Swiss-Prot record:
S-adenosyl-L-methionine binds at residues 153, 174, 196, 239. This is Ribosomal protein L11 methyltransferase. Keywords: Cytoplasm, Methyltransferase, S-adenosyl-L-methionine, Transferase. Methylates ribosomal protein L11. It catalyses: L-lysyl-[protein] + 3 S-adenosyl-L-methionine = N(6),N(6),N(6)-trimethyl-L-lysyl-[protein] + 3 S-adenosyl-L-homocysteine + 3 H(+). Its EC number is 2.1.1.-. Its main location: cytoplasm. One of its GO terms (biological process) is methylation. The lineage of its organism: Bacteria, Pseudomonadati, Pseudomonadota, Betaproteobacteria, Burkholderiales.
Length: 309
């Protein structure tokens, strides 16, 4: 079976509304990308919670809608344009054919074993383990963020390897796939807890943890609050994004035992000052390492709590 993609270049102000309108008009999937991708004008952009919809797109955005080959693409564009108050003539579009493929095989071919730090391997289930003597996680791409391919995940994993939490309690806040929680457990942490706001992430983390024979408890935030579990930890790791990390500064800092360590990633090098400022009343954070423009911040909680806190 073949498919047809509708490709439309629009201003940032229309990108999200047009995406929704194309869905409503019959598109099977819609993506938004930088119209200047691959050129000197390409603009790195990372959507974060708290962003206005118009901020989560590029000045020149390319909206790509996948449709059945037999669909009336011109009618889909016209309906979408009308629903957002534009004339169809204002939306110039091109079409491109997409041949059907063995998508499972294609996806698998894009994921190879990943070597992280000194002795960690993340290996998809369809690959052989390169080094059975290493610390190995079997992990497939799935519903939740975290396969070790992104610099922020690697930074947190490398921090854990360099500061092995032997016998310590560890909290992975925003656990996603559970990759950091599992690494902590395989590095001989005592109690390990993962928390995420996404039920699908919890489902994914539980599946991955059972596959890797790790003992980790996973909770949604409300479930954790009602669990009776100790609410502070020797090590707290949060690989999220700068805006939510700033908003959660009092809560995350409050999860760290006196003398314990807090590790944050999901922070761009250009965002270091604003994130460290948010945590300054609680924990002094410094840049531990940087990869590809992303940083890991780390700091130790005071042994005694400052007056007034």
């Amino acid at each position: 079976m073949s498919w047809t993609e509708i490709v439309i270049e629009v201003a940032r102000t229309h990108a999200e509304a047009l995406s929704d309108a194309l869905f409503d008009a019959g598109a099977l999937s819609v993506s938004v990308e930088d119209a200047d991708f691959g050129t000197d004008a390409e603009q790195p952009l990372f959507g974060e919670p708290g962003m206005e919809p118009t901020e989560a797109a590029w000045e020149r955005s390319r909206v790509v809608a996948l449709t059945p080959v037999e669909a009336d693409q011109a009618a889909i564009v016209a309906e979408a344009a009308e629903s957002i108050g534009l004339a169809a003539a204002d939306l110039a579009f091109t079409l491109r054919n997409v041949d059907d493929q063995d998508w499972v095989r294609l996806t698998q071919s894009q994921f190879e074993p990943i070597h992280i730090g000194k002795n960690i391997w993340v290996v998809p289930s369809w690959h052989d383990v390169p080094d059975p003597a290493a610390l190995v996680l079997e992990l497939d791409p799935g519903l939740a963020f975290g396969t070790g391919s992104h610099p922020t995940t690697r930074l947190c994993m490398e921090w854990l390897e360099a500061h092995a939490p032997i016998g310590l309690s560890v909290l992975d806040y925003g656990c996603g796939s559970g990759i950091l929680a599992m690494i902590a457990k395989k590095l001989d942490a005592d109690t390990v807890v993962g928390i995420d706001i996404d039920p699908q992430a919890i489902q994914s983390a539980v599946f991955n943890t059972e596959r890797n024979h790790c003992d980790v408890a996973y909770y949604l935030p409300d479930e954790f609050a009602a669990s009776g579990h100790a609410h502070t930890f020797d090590v707290v790791v949060a690989n999220i994004l700068a805006n939510p990390l700033k908003l959660m500064a009092p809560m995350l800092a409050g999860r760290v035992n006196p003398g314990g360590q807090l590790v944050l990633s999901g922070v761009l090098a250009t965002q270091v000052d604003e994130v460290t400022a948010a945590y300054a009343p609680f924990i002094a954070l410094t840049v531990w390492a940087e990869q590809e423009g992303w940083v890991a911040l780390a700091g130790r909680s005071p042994v005694t709590v400052p007056d007034g806190q």
